[in-house]
Amino acid sequence: MPPKQQPKADLAKKQKQVEDKTFGLKNKNKSKNVQKYVQSLKQSVQPKPDATKAAAKKKKEEEKAREQELNELFKVAISQPKVPVGVDPKSILCEFFKAGQCQKGFKCKFSHDLNIQRKGEKIDIYSDTRDEDGDMDEWDQETLEKVVESKKNEYNQNKPTDIVCKYFLDAVEKKQYGWFWSCPNGGKECHYRHALPPGYVLKSQMKALLEEESSKKLAVEDEIENERAKLQTATQMTPALFMEWKRKKIAERDAGLAASQAERAKNDRMSGRELFLSNASLFVDDAEACEEYEREREQEETEQKAKNKEAEAGTSKSSGDAEQSSKEVNEEEEDDDDDDDDLDMDELDELEASLSKTSIQIREPNDEGSS
């Protein structure tokens, strides 16, 4: 560790002692011995210099001198680029600053920003940079023949196309496309186009346009008011007019439905619902329909049998015929009982009436025989 420096108060005190000791000495500025004595006193007061610090300082000065010498040698090889007409020099990076040799600082007319190249002209996404490689304006005949020969097989294997590369579109949409972008599909060897077709609108741009249009679009209330303002003056709407209009619309609707149903009925294309609405009496439940059919059939059979019995009873006057008819009636009744044990009240009444008639017919021959 370097020695600690003495406080300023101690230094001032020692200097005062040196002045006191040298005060009044004769020939202070002439005698060499006196000057040596004074010098020894001053050295005793001043702190001793650190040898390591002095050596480090000397080494640093030597390195700085050597570096400056090298810079002077390499400075000859560095040259500033030529500035085209109409171009701002601040848009061009200083070559001396790039090599760490520019001594002008902020006064330099060139830019000292290492990112100035990235901030320069943006790449054109509507043109393919590979199209410039095929410029043959400066080719001679020999070069042209070599290129044709080398490209003959390559062209057949990798024919150019107008299809836009999907990786290029993805990079443009994600804002990753730039001078340093490389296509994952082979870089410059990709045979798809790396340029947008004329008039192509990106999805992000389309979204911004839609948002702008939606912001300019009027609200629904404003549109309604504008449309109402465009309407011409007409009859004022009243409840009576509204009810009349409603009745008219209902009548028109009913007429249209009736016409359509009539047309469908004419073509036998009516649905079950339409048939039910037109005539509901045609439809009954399945169980009730079966019972009603059986009841009607039994009534018809009973009436027909009663008529037949009356006709037979009027023509025959013998008791044998009456007994035979009564047996037939009994057999028919048994058959009816077998067919259907449960008879309605109407059927029972009719059966009782027919039996009473047959009993009367049976009694009449007996009365005649007794007389």
Curated annotation (Swiss-Prot):
Residues 34-46 have a biased composition (Polar residues). InterPro entries: ZC3H15/TMA46_C (IPR032378), Znf_CCCH (IPR000571), Znf_CCCH_sf (IPR036855). Residues 1-64, 290-371 are annotated as: Disordered. A zinc finger (C3H1-type) spans 88-115, 159-197. Pfam families: DFRP_C, zf-CCCH. One of its GO terms (molecular function) is DNA binding. One of its GO terms (cellular component) is mitochondrion. Residues 330-352 have a biased composition (Acidic residues). Residues 10-23, 292-312 have a biased composition (Basic and acidic residues). The keyword Manganese does not apply. Keywords: Coiled coil, DNA-binding, Metal-binding, Repeat, Zinc, Zinc-finger. It comes from the Eukaryota. Residues 205-237, 283-317 form a coiled coil. This is Zinc finger CCCH domain-containing protein 21.
